[in-house]
Amino acid sequence: GWWTPVVTHELDYAIPADLWDSCRSEEPMPQGKTAFGVKFSADGGEVVICGAVIPKEGPARIEMIDRRPTGLGTQWLADFLNARYNTASCVVIDGRNGVDVLVEKITNKDTGAWKFKGSVIRPRATDMIAAVSLLMDELTEQSVTWYYKQEPLKDSAITSVKRPISGGWGFGGDNSTPIEACALALYGAKTSKRDPSRKMRIG
């Protein structure tokens, strides 16, 4: 009504829209060292998988691959990841619900493909802070790009807000899951010591 106080505080957006737009690209996904990031949303409602590729030359690329309600289970994710173990360096998986089940499905000695030690990463708070810091640095330096047709990813990026974590900050807000998954994927690609694409390039 008339007497409702005016809210004057502004949301502390994590990624300025102009910074995000400056890194858009119409180029196809490059070839190179690949990693996946999986984020289960804070409210437990959805899960998002993103990919990151670091080519030998040129900027890295982040892309959203899929997002689905957690009510559909995690078998589709496990199948996707198990099929790509031989081409990806690692997968970084974070969230409250569904993580344990997914990790079991991809590392189980009978059904899982992810055998290499350290190829499945469950980030701590310090890792999350580092992943966000890395993505922000890469955006600022324009050393990472996103595919221009990925409007849902753009929406997540430019509406995410700063969420305090353990002395640093991560992405928060109602739609931060996609950009969180991208940050995890890029962090995995940058920090993993495993790179199956190197073997593929020999000869």
Language-model segment annotations:
Residues 39, 49, 91-94, 181:
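Short, conserved catalytic/metal-binding motifs centered on acidic residues
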Residues 28-55:
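Gly/Thr-rich phosphate-binding beta-strand-loop-beta motif of the actin/hexokinase/Hsp70
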Residues 42, 46-50, 128-139, 183-185:
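Short, Φ-rich (hydrophobic/aromatic) sequence segments
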Residues 56-167:
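Mg2+-dependent endonuclease catalytic cores in nucleic-acid-processing enzymes, primarily RNase H-like
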Residues 1-37:
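ATPase catalytic-site recognition across NTP-hydrolyzing enzymes
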Residues 2, 39-44, 53, 69, ...:
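Short, flexible loop/turn elements at secondary-structure junctions
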Residues 162-203:
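Charge-patterned, long linear interaction tracts outside catalytic cores
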